[in-house]
Swiss-Prot record:
Lineage of the organism: Eukaryota, Metazoa, Chordata, Craniata, Vertebrata
Keywords: Keratin, Repeat
Protein name: Keratin-associated protein 21-1
Summary of subunit composition and partner proteins: Interacts with hair keratins.
Function, as annotated: In the hair cortex, hair keratin intermediate filaments are embedded in an interfilamentous matrix, consisting of hair keratin-associated proteins (KRTAP), which are essential for the formation of a rigid and resistant hair shaft through their extensive disulfide bond cross-linking with abundant cysteine residues of hair keratins. The matrix proteins include the high-sulfur and high-glycine-tyrosine keratins.
Gene Ontology cellular component terms for the protein in this record: cytosol; intermediate filament
Disulfide bonding pattern of the chain: none
Organism: Homo sapiens
Keyword flag DNA-binding: no
Highest taxon in the source lineage: Eukaryota
Gene: KRTAP21-1
């Protein structure tokens, strides 16, 4: 499981989850502790950031945008 509470990382600058250029997963971006971040995306399947299919941030397909608590919950439920 890519996105978790244990600090596992598969992207740079992320505390947990998937980061820059990841294939799938959700989690953290640049400098975030957990949840939805800014740099999680660029082709990630579930995540946050630019061009994501589901999640939060700029250009998300399903409209779960912004820096709201729902954004965090969505990322974990997506995983």
């Amino acid at each position: 499981m890519c996105c978790n509470y244990y600090g596992n990382s598969c992207g740079y600058g992320s505390g947990c989850g998937c980061g820059y250029g990841s294939g799938s997963g959700c989690g953290c971006g640049y400098g975030t502790g957990y949840g939805c971040g800014y740099g999680c995306g660029f082709g990630s399947h579930y995540g946050c950031g630019y061009g994501t299919g589901y999640g939060c941030g700029y250009g998300s397909g399903s409209g779960y945008c912004g820096y709201r608590p729902f954004c965090f919950r969505r990322c974990y439920s997506s995983c």
